[in-house]
């Protein structure tokens, strides 16, 4: 079972990270980013932020590069907003679950079309 404190810190980090990306990041590569979740380790030392990006593969790579470049600033801002002894080390990862869900939905839709045509 996940540590309750880690879950609460992850949820708070998700809210603050979304706000930071919308209001404070000025990098033009970091646009149309949605934070879908944040996993924090039990010792609160590391956090993985799962993001989705609206756009093609090239825009996704550029966004990830922009986030990696701004990682220090983002961590500093999180430290100011969330009262923790040590701000977790951030890493960013693409959330593939939305694309996976869309693919399954389109396959099911195609199956339903084929069944209704027969």
Swiss-Prot record:
UniProt-recorded name of the protein: Ribosome-binding factor A
InterPro entries associated with the record: KH_dom-like_a/b (IPR015946), RbfA (IPR000238), RbfA_dom_sf (IPR023799), Ribosome-bd_factorA_CS (IPR020053)
Keyword Protease listed: no
Keywords recorded for this protein, A-Z: Cytoplasm, Ribosome biogenesis
Gene3D superfamilies reported in the protein's UniProt record: 3.30.300.20
Keyword match Lipid biosynthesis: no
Organism field: Shouchella clausii (strain KSM-K16) (Alkalihalobacillus clausii)
Role this protein plays: One of several proteins that assist in the late maturation steps of the functional core of the 30S ribosomal subunit. Associates with free 30S ribosomal subunits (but not with 30S subunits that are part of 70S ribosomes or polysomes). Required for efficient processing of 16S rRNA. May interact with the 5'-terminal helix region of 16S rRNA.
Gene Ontology molecular function: ribosomal small subunit binding
First and last residue of the signal peptide: none
GO terms (BP aspect): maturation of SSU-rRNA
Main location: cytoplasm
Assembly with partners or alone: Monomer. Binds 30S ribosomal subunits, but not 50S ribosomal subunits or 70S ribosomes.
UniProt-listed SUPFAM superfamilies: Ribosome-binding factor A, RbfA
């Amino acid at each position: 079972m996940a540590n309750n404190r880690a879950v609460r810190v992850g949820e708070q980090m998700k809210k603050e990270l979304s706000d930071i990306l919308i209001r404070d990041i000025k990098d033009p590569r970091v646009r149309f980013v949605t934070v879908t979740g944040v996993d924090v380790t039990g010792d609160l030392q590391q956090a993985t932020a799962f993001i989705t990006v609206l756009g093609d593969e090239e825009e996704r790579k550029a966004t990830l590069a922009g986030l990696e470049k701004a990682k220090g600033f983002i961590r500093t801002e999180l430290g100011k907003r969330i009262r923790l002894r040590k701000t977790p080390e951030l890493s960013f990862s693409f959330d593939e679950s939305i694309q996976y869900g869309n693919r399954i939905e389109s396959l099911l839709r195609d199956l339903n079309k084929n069944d209704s045509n027969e």
